[in-house]
Every structure is written in structure tokens, then in C-alpha cells.
Amino acid sequence: MASEICKTISVARLEKHKNLFLNYRNLHHFPLELLKDEGLQHLERLYMKRNSLTTLPENLAQKLPNLVELYLHSNNIVVVPEAIGSLVKLQCLDLSDNALEIVCPEIGGLRALRHLRLANNQLQFLPPEVGDLKELQTLDISSNRLLALPERLHLCLSLQYLTVDRNRLCCVPRHLCQLPSLNELSMAGNHLASLPIDLGRSRELQYVYVDNNIQLKGLPSYLYNKVIGCNGCGIPIQLSEVRLLTFSSGQLTVFLPAEVKTIGTEKDHVLPLQELTMRSLYRTYHGLWKDLNFLSPISLPRSLLELLHCPLGHCHLCSEPMFTFVYPKIFPLRETPMAGLHQRRTSIGFVAYCCSTQCLRTFNLLC
């Protein structure tokens, strides 16, 4: 087997092959023949699926500098080494079905990367540097142990497909709603109890799958005209299990995002002072300075500064920004024309988040 592999690599070097297939070769170590002398300078695509590799060589980028695609599906790799960040031409990296516990920060150096697949590993977190991947279009991190997503993920401005199924997420960063190119978001099989108020506000986002998040009972009304998956949601549980603000209408009780501190009804015509102040500051920021540098952490707590950068959400009727206070309104799914599409599980509802009593009275999802 070893001699056969050496021969395959030698031929590839001699004939300057751009593609090299070393799948199913029972490799326990990265072939030294690949790293010999100057390496394979012409190689662009390396496929090493279903071997037994545990690591990657530190001089990988030096010996294979023109790699565009690296396919390492189904190995035993535990750590993505720092050297991976030097593969500046890499566009596709597949490390699905390995034993990954750590993705090094240097992955942010892969500025040409378009597709990153890390499904079925042991990851508990992603480095913030993932946000440096400006060309990234596809990110699959399903079937890991992630408790949260990095907020800097919203800086991946080219991201179109995000798959985070079967992790341990309890919340979704509201910053993800700022992704301008996101078309499909799948978060099935997590521990979500609420979704960001602005999720679905972007016209680009057309597909949202949140199946089997049993505590999730409310979907932002922006998702009403999208393709959604919500089977297995809204299973009755003890409210004490979730420490979030709740809102009830009829027999349906939904959890609200953690940033929501207070809710209003049609009788609450006056907004809390903090909410009024935040809205005024936001209008000033957008109308005059276009820059939050005029506010410092000394004059305003960091948590409120972050809300000014990225509001809690926007009114589902008039798009007024909201920060800590909302007027919610529930439309049970079973009472909408979509009920027939979700016969197995209809004990959830669409939640409209409004900025005032006037918008609350006016908003009608079904008109």
C-alpha cells in the first residue's frame, strides 16, 4: 500500500497534476512523499477522505501553496493546526466527521475560504476569528457541542448557508440578523426558547429550520412568508425551566428574547424612560454623528452601547428601532393559513413585536 501511494504521488509530481485522490487508503500519517523537496506546487485539490489521520503537518502551506480545496472528511483529526491559516488560496475546507475539539484562531487567515464544513465533531466553541472570513458562503457546524455562536459571525458578509443543527445552543445572537447575504439558516435540534426579533427581516433570508427545539413557541412574524420548519416545537414544559420573560395570549405562552426587559399592552401608552432615551440617542446617532464614538463606556454602560450599535429589533409594522421594551402580539399558527402545513405540531405562534400602542393595534399578520 505504501509503495502504491508513493507511486501515485510521484506520478502526480512528475505530471504536475492539479487533483490528487488519496481516499480510503488507511493512512495514519500524512504521506511524507507529499512534503518531499518542494512538495507539489501545482496541486490544487487534495482528497483524503476516510483515512485515520490525527494531525496535519506544520509545513503544509509551504509544500502545497496552491491548494484550493482540502477534503479531510472522516479522519481522526483533533486540532486544526495554526499552519492551516497560511493556505491563502484555500476556498473549500472539509473537516466533517473528525474528532475536532479546537479550531485555531489562525483559521481567520483563510481570506479566500468560501466553504467550511466542520459537522460531526466535538467543538464547544468557535474562535472569534471566524468573523474574518469575508468570502465565506457556506458554514456547516452541525452535530457538535456548541453552547453559543460568536457574535463576530455577522461580519461574514458573504455567508449564504449556515447550518447549526444538533448542538446545545440556548440563544441566537441578534447580530446574525445583520448578515446581508444569508439565504438559509438551520438550527434544528438545539435548546432554543426564543429567536431574535429581527430574524427574517432581511429579504435574502428565505429558509429557516428550527425543528425539534421543544421550548420554542414563538416565531418572529417576519418569518410568516418564509419557508420554515418547526415540527417538534412548542412541547409543554415547566416555565421554571427557562429563565426568560414570557407573554401569553389565550392558551399560548411564548418566551421572549433575553434582551427584552419589559413588555407593554394597549393600556401602556407611555414608554419607559430608558427606552425613550435609547430611541432618542439612536436617532441622534443616525441623524448627525453617524458614529458612536461620541458616547463612551463612562457615559453609557457597555451593554447599552452595544444595543445602540445593534438594536434589540425593529418594529414589525413601522421599523422603528427598539432596545429593551416591546409590545408583543401573538398569532397562533393554528389560526393562520399555514396551519395545514404543520398538522403535527401547531402549538406555536407568530409574534409581532411593535414599538407603540398604535402599531400594536394596527398590525395584522393575516391582512
From Swiss-Prot:
SMART domains assigned: LRR_BAC, LRR_TYP
Domain of life: Eukaryota
Gene3D superfamilies per the UniProt record, alphabetical: Ribonuclease Inhibitor (3.80.10.10)
UniProt keywords, alphabetically: Leucine-rich repeat, Repeat
Start and stop residues of the LRR repeats: 16-36, 42-63, 66-87, 89-111, 112-133, 135-156, 158-180, 181-202, 204-226
Alphabetized PANTHER family for the sequence: LEUCINE-RICH REPEAT-CONTAINING PROTEIN 28, PTHR48051
Protein name per UniProt: Leucine-rich repeat-containing protein 28
Species: Mus musculus
